[in-house]
Design a protein with these regions (language model features):
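Conserved catalytic-core segment of nucleotide-activated headgroup transferases in glycan assembly
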Residues: 5, 10-29, 143-149, 154-227, ...
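Membrane-proximal helix-turn-helix segments that form the acceptor-binding/catalytic region
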Residues: 86, 98-118
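Donor nucleotide-sugar binding/catalytic pocket of nucleotide-sugar-dependent glycosyltransferases
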Residues: 113-149
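Nucleotide-sugar-dependent
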Residues: 168-171, 219-220, 224-255, 261-272
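Conserved acidic donor-binding segment of nucleotide-sugar-dependent glycosyltransferases
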Residues: 274-285, 293-298
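A charged, aromatic-enriched C-terminal amphipathic alpha-helix characteristic of glycosyltransferases
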Residues: 299-330, 334-336, 494
């Protein structure tokens, strides 16, 4: 069996536990070849066609929706790995930007439904994914590849408590910092060690020789850090994101002989045996009581240390569980005798370890990645042209070059490049959508419509093609616009950008009632993370409608609802005030204008105080997050 995984390459915990370690273990099973392939690899199209099982690791590529459909028709299996609850990300988290993009969230919702199977890390995540329409959900908990022998408990150092975590978990530590600081002040014989991002260093004020701090690094450096600890903390605020996290910190602590005190939430309730393999706490006093008990009872520390290590070594080693993953894959396949072979060219370029192969970014992929990080098309396109001279069949590079040339309004050249792409993969919705865009810019609506229709026929779930099509139909006031808008709404029912884009496809006089319906449908689901982008999109749609049909009687209820849902927008509030005044409700209108003035003055003060700063101060974000979660 050929199993290919589309992924990025990393050396942190997630990369090891969820991506590379399982692939390596699968490749060690008889009759299995497992390949980790970078998402920009020039060999990916071939692997997509050949692999019996294709695993998608949070890839932000709408083309993968069509891959699911195409592979199912060919009797092959596509699995979506979804091991984080991406609807509740912390705003300061480095990955918050892309994951909070409504288009990315919609992509993941589509993949949950379109994939033949969804694999995840916890029962809580599996429950949520099933509720969102996922089929055949399997839980594969994180496992360790090995557990070292338990070394003797250190006796020649001060008792050390500690924590290590990624930036996304800063609030989990921050909300406990005051009570921990007080306990540490009361026990100067106890030391603290922390490993995370530099922003957390000031959370504690301790003498330098009592406080070890280091910035986060690789998984190996993290495991080395854990050997400093006697007691490890695992705080979690009761957020949706945290409830869906795995118990991997218990595995890491126990494997290194660290006694853990864990938040009494879903990730740890099943795996941590209370007072057998670790301790669970419900609030700050509970945590402090456990710390005090472990500080004064060395025998308890040693017992938990030994029992936790023994449990993990006996029950949580990957080699003892990997066969169940293979069995699940086999059960998804229409027939069990699938045995696709790996092309010789791919094998020759891969880094091989028995049945496990790695295709990390090589020279062409690194070149494309650099080009994609260049914001100016005028600089990126010539660099990509040079890369394509060396790798003329590199599909992702050809497609990106076609898009860049369209951005530069060099549409004839774009078509030449995109036709080369189509020759390699005729059913690529990405290629066809860019061809449609080029023809539209060349004023050939018939060819543009044909290309976009082909893209949607081959892959009805390719959102960018729908966006191009709806814009084109709206600009042309095409009579078919409303029908296509309704079709898009059925495919993307939870995507407000599609709903707003569809408004212009209808007759202009219907816009207020349609936007009002969209506001009612989506307004209650917006949280603090999604509001900024939603406010911008809805404000633009509402104010464009006010400008287009200023005398419509339906504007007043629309503006009332918009300013109710987005009371922080001075422009929406001001527009509502103007509409009230126009309707003869002067005093109510003046009240709204007074509100708008206060909002404007507040924004002016903030702009004056913060000048060019675009990042919210971290303590503010952490405090807001803690209070929202119900932290103490």
């Amino acid at each position: 069996m050929l199993i290919a995984q589309v992924c990025d390459f990393g050396n942190d915990g997630d990369a090891r536990y969820r991506v590379h370690d399982p692939s390596r273990a699968l490749g060690g099973l008889p009759g299995v070849t497992a390949v980790d392939c970078h998402f920009l690899s020039r060999f990916l199209p071939e692997l997509i066609e050949r692999a019996d099982v294709l695993v998608l690791q949070f890839v932000m590529d709408w083309e993968m929706t069509g891959v699911c459909l195409r592979r199912r028709a060919a009797g092959k299996v596509t699995v979506f790995e979804a091991n984080d609850y991406f609807f509740d990300l912390q705003p300061w988290n480095p990955i918050a930007g892309p994951w909070q993009d409504p288009a990315v969230q919609e992509l993941y919702l589509q993949l949950l439904k379109l994939a033949d199977g969804v694999q995840t890390s916890t029962p809580e995540l599996a429950r949520r994914w099933k509720r969102l329409g996922a089929r055949n959900v399997a839980v594969f908990p994180n496992q360790l590849t090995s557990v070292p022998e338990l070394s003797p408990a250190p006796q020649d150092r001060p008792l050390t408590i500690g924590w290590a975590g990624s930036p996304g978990h800063l609030a989990d530590l921050y909300h406990l910092a005051p009570c921990l600081q007080g306990w540490l002040d009361a026990h100067p014989d106890v030391h603290l060690a922390v490993m995370t991002t530099e922003a957390a260093r000031p959370f504690f004020n301790l003498p330098p020789d009592h406080y070890h701090f280091e910035t986060f690094g690789s998984l190996d450096s993290y495991l080395q850090f854990l050997r400093r600890l006697d007691i490890g903390l695992a705080p979690l605020l009761p957020t949706d994101y945290n409830r869906c996290r795995s118990d991997v910190k218990f595995l890491e602590y126990a494997s290194q002989g660290v006694v853990g005190i864990f938040a009494d939430l879903e990730p740890y309730r099943e795996s941590v045996g209370y007072k057998k393999t670790g301790l669970l706490y419900r609030d700050s006093p509970d945590l402090i009581a456990h710390l005090e008990g472990l500080r004064t009872d060395r025998d308890l520390r040693l017992a938990l240390r030994q029992q936790g290590h023994a449990y993990v070594r006996r029950n949580r080693v990957l080699s003892n569980h990997i066969a169940s993953r293979l069995s699940w894959y086999q059960g998804l396949l229409p027939k069990h005798d699938s045995n696709s072979s790996l092309p010789a060219e791919i094998a020759a370029h891969a880094v091989r370890d028995g049945g496990y192969l790695r295709l990390p970014p090589q020279e062409p992929e690194r070149g494309l990645r650099d080009v994609m990080s260049t914001s100016a098309p005028a600089q990126a396109s010539p660099a990509l042209a040079r890369l394509l001279e060396q790798s003329p069949q590199y599909l992702s590079a050809l497609q990106h070059q076609g898009r860049l040339l369209n951005d530069l309004r060099q549409h004839r050249q774009a078509l030449e490049v995109l036709e080369r792409s189509r020759a390699i993969q005729p059913q690529s919705a990405r290629t066809l959508a860019e061809i449609g865009r080029a023809w539209y810019r060349l004023n050939d609506d018939a060819r543009a419509l044909a290309a976009l229709d082909h893209a949607i026929t081959f892959n009805p779930h390719y959102l960018p093609a729908w966006q191009y099509l709806l814009r084109m139909l709206s600009v042309n006031q095409d009579a078919d616009g409303p029908r296509r808008a309704e079709e898009a709404a059925k495919i993307f029912p939870t995507c407000y950008p599609v709903a707003l884009l569809s408004v212009a496809a209808y007759p202009r006089e219907r816009a207020p009632s349609i936007i009002l319906e969209v506001l009612d449908r989506f307004g209650s689901s917006l949280d603090s993370n999604s509001r900024p982008a939603a406010l911008s999109a809805f404000r633009e749609a509402v104010l464009a409608t006010v400008k287009a049909i200023p005398d419509s009687p339906e504007l007043l209820p629309l503006l009332a609802r918009a300013s109710e849902l987005f009371p922080e927008s001075p422009r929406l509030v001001a527009a509502y005030g103007a509409a009230l005044i126009a309707a003869g409700r002067d005093r109510e209108g003046w009240e709204q204008h007074r509100r708008a003035l206060a909002l404007f003055r507040g924004a002016t003060v903030a702009q004056d105080e913060f000048q060019n700063e675009r990042t919210t101060p971290l303590p503010w974000e952490l405090a807001s997050h803690i209070l929202k979660a119900g932290g103490e």
